[in-house]
A protein has these predicted regions:
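Conserved catalytic-core motifs of eukaryotic protein kinase domains, centered on the activation segment
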Residues: 1-3, 63-64, 163-164
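Conserved hydrolase catalytic core segment
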Residues: 19-62
Length: 212
């Protein structure tokens, strides 16, 4: 039904949590996943044990968001080859080395019956219908209500969440912890998964110790 409004994303998250029977889940969300978690928790509809927000906060940069949209809007009718896909990714993420072996791209795309390569996401999600100013205000309000352990992870090269945007969130949520991953852009885990994973595991072991 192509319902990708922020509120529908929250409803989807609540449904997933309910389906697995998690009483107090640990939420780790990057970009849209992080903002969805923030809205769900900050509005009191989901009680989580801890939350990790990856390169997202209420104050993000429009230019960075526009770059993501431009990347997603490329080749709406599909890519002709894996090389063309790799070129698009390399243009969007110049900090990464373009892979010589393109077999790994197969998990990020699908080969359609038309012989073209398409992203896994629904192309209809590009048709944003909600008001971004109102959306960001709702994130601001949600951030004021956080009382659970929170870790904010920022990619040091990110043009979506700047250092100023991160510090603004930390002022709103002073008990939150913060990690700046140098050498990583918006796709933090993809750029520096070693540092990212280590920071998340360390945080969770401290704030939500494993049972037994």
């Amino acid at each position: 039904d192509a319902a990708y409004e922020p509120e529908m994303n929250v409803q989807d998250l609540l449904a997933v949590v309910d389906s697995i029977g998690a009483q107090q889940p640990i939420l780790v969300g990057a970009s849209m996943g992080g903002s969805t978690s923030l809205l769900a928790v900050g509005t009191g509809r989901l009680h989580a044990a801890a939350m990790v927000m990856v390169d997202i906060a209420p104050r993000i940069e429009p230019e960075g968001s526009d770059r993501i949209k431009a990347f997603m809007d490329q080749k709406p009718d599909g890519f002709d080859s894996l090389d063309e896909v790799a070129d698009a990714i390399a243009s969007y993420q110049p900090q990464r080395t373009r892979p010589r072996n393109l077999d790994g791209l197969a998990k990020n795309i699908r080969l359609g019956s038309d012989g073209k390569y398409h992203w896994h996401w629904d192309p209809r999600r590009r048709n944003r219908t909600w008001d971004m100013s109102e959306y960001r205000q709702s994130l601001e309000r949600a951030a004021d209500n956080l009382n659970l352990p929170v870790l904010l992870v920022r990619g040091g090269l990110s043009d979506v969440l700047t250092e100023e945007g991160a510090q603004s969130f930390l002022q709103q949520c002073p008990h939150a912890e913060y990690v700046n991953v140098t050498g990583a852009a918006h796709m933090v885990a993809g750029d520096r998964n070693d540092v990212f994973s280590g920071a998340v595991v360390d945080f969770l072991h401290r704030v939500v110790p494993p049972e037994g």
